[in-house]
Structure formats: C-alpha cells, structure tokens
Amino acid sequence: SMLAIANNKHVYVEKPMARTFHEAELMMQAARKHPNIVTQVGNQGHSEANYFQFKAWMDAGIIKDVTAITAHMNNPRRWHKWDTNIYKLPSGQQLPKDLDWDTWLGVTPYHEYNKDYHLGQWRCWYDFGMGALGDWGAHILDTAHEFLELGLPYEVTMQYAKGHNDYFFPYSSTILFRFPQRK
C-alpha cells in the first residue's frame, strides 16, 4: 500500500490492513499526504445481509439498550489449528522462484522463507499476522461495533487462551473488551 501511494496509485486493502497500530498510522499519514489518491479499506461484512439487517433494526429502534455483546466463531480454518509443539522458528527452505520474498515480507522483521510463513499460515505467527482473533474479529465484531458506535475499549482482558507460545497467537481464546458507556 505504501509503495502504491508513493507512486500515485489508488489503493484498496482488505483486512488485515496492517499488522500493528503503528503500521496503520503510517498508512493513514501517507494517504493524507496524497489527497488525490483514493484509498479504501474493505470488509466483505459490509456487503452481507446481516450488516444491513442490523442497521435496519437500529434505525427502527429495535436494538437500543445494549449492555453486552457475545461474538464467537466456531468454524476453524486450516490455519487456526497450528502445531503447538513448535518451540523455535522454522528453518529456511528453498524460495519458490516466482515469489519475491522481500516484497512479501514488507516491513516485517526478516525471516528466511519457509512454507509455514506463507499461504495462510502467516496468520498465526506474531511477526506476520494477528492470530484467529485478528483474522476473524473484523468480521464478527465490526457490524455491532460500527452501529453501536463503541469506539476504543478502555480495558481488554484475556480470559482464556489455547494453542499459543512465544512464536504464535492462540488458535482459541476468550477475550473481554470493556467499552465506555454509550451515549
């Protein structure tokens, strides 16, 4: 995205837009410096029926005094059940000839190519992704977060985590987000 903006190209990104808040800030700063460049962040949930149904219920006053939201995903993907016996970074492998590894890495700390960092698996590693929550949180939390105008949480507490270590995120977790009282 940064390279495209610097070269006066319009940018459309899907989640994950960035891996860290700092990376997202840098992207927003770059977009502000190029006001004639169109930038957009997509979330396919904004095109699905549940998004419009929730909005209709909000507009009709059916949803109003919300004090708690429970959101979950119980449909694991192939990359959400990684090998929890990994206790070191994987060794380098032969780089596929059609992959520009340096471009793929972007601003991520350098790692030698390994298939376990690529093709979906990148989601689990701290240096590449954001785990199952980062992968699916945008889908399962976004609609309620937007229409209830929740803003940023003032407290986030990990209540349960399974399948993580010093190298990758949990593949299962229960996290409590506390938000300021709504207006």
What do these predicted regions represent?
Residues 178:
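Short hydrophobic/aromatic beta-strand micro-patches
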